A protein has these predicted regions:
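Flexible cytoplasmic inter-helical loops of multi-pass small-molecule transporters
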Residues: 197-217, 418-429
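Interfacial helix-cap and linker-helix signal at transmembrane-aqueous boundaries
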Residues: 47-48, 79-80, 159-171, 254-255, ...
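Helix-loop-helix hairpin linking two adjacent transmembrane segments in secondary transporters
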Residues: 153-199
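Conserved MFS/SLC helix-loop-helix module at the cytosolic interface between two early adjacent transmembrane helices
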Residues: 71-109, 296-302
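C-terminal transmembrane helical hairpin of 12-TM major facilitator-type secondary transporters
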Residues: 273-350
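Extracytoplasmic gate region of multi-pass secondary transporters
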Residues: 40-44, 224-292
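Hydrophobic core of transmembrane alpha-helices in multi-pass small-molecule transporters
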Residues: 31, 99, 110-124, 237, ...
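Intracellular juxtamembrane helix-capping segments at the cytosolic ends
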Residues: 47, 125-138, 146, 342-355
Length: 437
């Protein structure tokens, strides 16, 4: 079960600065779509104040966006692998601009929901393309490249959240939607002209023995038929759902613990516990993605997963047991987000190592749909909390993270090596010139 194109062609020198330029442009594009997810919360109350649709109805647009952004990535990625990244990123730039322009004129929930679909398609086009392109340019540093690209998705919101909030306050949310929508979309559209895929397959460094990497480019149908893909998908869903269930409830938990407004002093700063925790969230999340990607490039994907998932379980257990202490709440939350965001660097890198570079965008896009699947499970946290309290939510999240950590070492690691070596041995036996019985 191998694709016909299995040859690895000698490429440009891996030290070439051109591929780093490609990475930087991808990160900037990711920063430009970040506000569609992380900046949305700034608009909810102003929209409700203008139209009185209710927070729940307005927030449903966000759910539509996440599902659309995630589940359509494999389709968009197929176009990338077939026609190249440029046209897909250009399309994404147009769509993200159109989405926020529609939001600026939305006078009904129908228009708001339609804009969420448009924005999801646009953001997914840019996200899947930039991560997939990074995997192709950096087979020797897939973890770092995927992590840095994914970090751009959070960094963009950190840079623009204050200007957006100021514009909403001074000119209204409609103006903020329109102006930032056009600006973000235009930057993505223009950068698309300069983004390209490698003209030849870049070979990974042979000396990295901790990183078993296939020499075969598996097609998407072949990937879907492989058990290792579905095991990776399951672990992705477990970590993402466990993390999202806890992360989505951080504010309610802080209020129920009666520490949300308690002052916390740390490193010369003093803020309310909840505000401090949320502020550190983006910093640690953004730093964690490239950091754990870099670590995985050096010690191996599964070993890094074990460390990250295990640390996540430990931090959730800490929150459950000692989270009533404001300082513990802030620190445990920060560390947790630092190890949670790495799923967006480790799984793309592992996918590229396992299934090859040629169809990396599509194959990683299929794996990325696990985020959408996990998002559908998040409302379960509210149901569990209402019936059994927050302790039960933490028990579930800890169990999911701990199980995922063990599966990374004792299931994914041996299965992935058997998959790579088995298929390469089969390809060698059937290759032209191979000895026959």
């Amino acid at each position: 079960m191998v694709s016909s194109n299995t040859a690895v062609t000698q490429a440009q020198p891996s030290s070439s600065g051109f591929r780093w330029l490609q990475l930087v442009m991808g990160i900037v594009c990711m920063a430009m779509i970040a506000n569609l997810q992380y900046g949305w919360t700034l608009f909810v109350d102003p929209i409700d104040g203008a139209h009185h649709w209710g927070r729940a109805s307005i927030q449903f647009a966000f759910t539509i966006f996440v599902v659309t952004e995630t589940w359509l990535v494999p389709v968009e990625a197929w176009f990338v692998d077939k026609y190249g990244p440029r046209i897909v990123i250009m399309f994404g730039g147009v769509m993200i601009a159109l989405a926020w322009v529609l939001n600026s004129y939305a006078d009904s929930l129908t228009v708001l929901y339609a804009a969420a679909v448009v924005g999801g398609i646009g953001a997914g086009s840019v996200y899947g393309t930039c991560v997939g392109n990074a995997l192709k340019w950096f087979p020797d540093r897939r973890g770092l490249a995927a992590g840095a690209t994914a970090a751009g998705f959070g960094a963009g919101a950190a840079i623009t959240v204050v200007p957006i909030a100021n514009m909403i306050a001074s000119s209204g949310y409609q103006t903020a939607f329109f102006d930032f929508g056009i600006g973000q979309g235009l930057i993505v559209f223009l950068l698309a002209f300069f983004i390209q895929k490698p003209t030849v397959t870049l070979p990974p460094k042979k000396k990295q023995l901790n990183l078993p990497q296939t020499k075969i480019d598996f097609t998407p149908p072949q990937v879907l038929r492989s058990p290792i893909f579905w095991v990776m998908y399951l672990v992705f869903v477990m970590v993402a759902s466990g993390g999202l269930m806890a992360a989505a409830q951080i504010a309610p938990i802080a209020h129920d613990y009666k520490i949300a407004t308690t002052p916390v002093s740390l490193a010369g700063f003093q803020m309310a516990a909840l505000t401090f925790a949320i502020s550190l969230d983006r910093i640690f999340d953004g730093f964690g993605r490239p950091f754990f990607g870099w670590v995985s490039d050096n010690i191996g994907r599964e070993h890094t997963m074990f460390i990250a998932f295990g640390t996540g379980a430990l931090m959730l257990l800490t929150l459950s047991t000692w989270g009533h202490n404001p300082l513990v709440f802030v620190l445990a939350t920060a560390v947790y987000f630092g190890v949670f965001g790495e799923i967006y660097s480790l799984f793309p890198a592992t996918s590229g190592d396992t299934f090859g570079s040629k169809f990396a965008t599509t194959n990683n896009g299929m794996l990325y749909t696990a985020k959408g699947t996990a998002a559908l499970l998040v409302p379960a946290a509210s149901i569990v909390a209402a019936s059994y309290g927050w302790q039960a939510v933490f028990v579930i999240a800890v169990a999911l993270n701990a199980t995922a950590a063990l599966m990374a070492l004792f299931v994914i690691k041996p299965m992935r090596r058997a998959f790579i070596h088995g298929n390469e041995a089969a390809a060698a036996e059937t290759a032209p010139g191979a000895k026959t019985a």
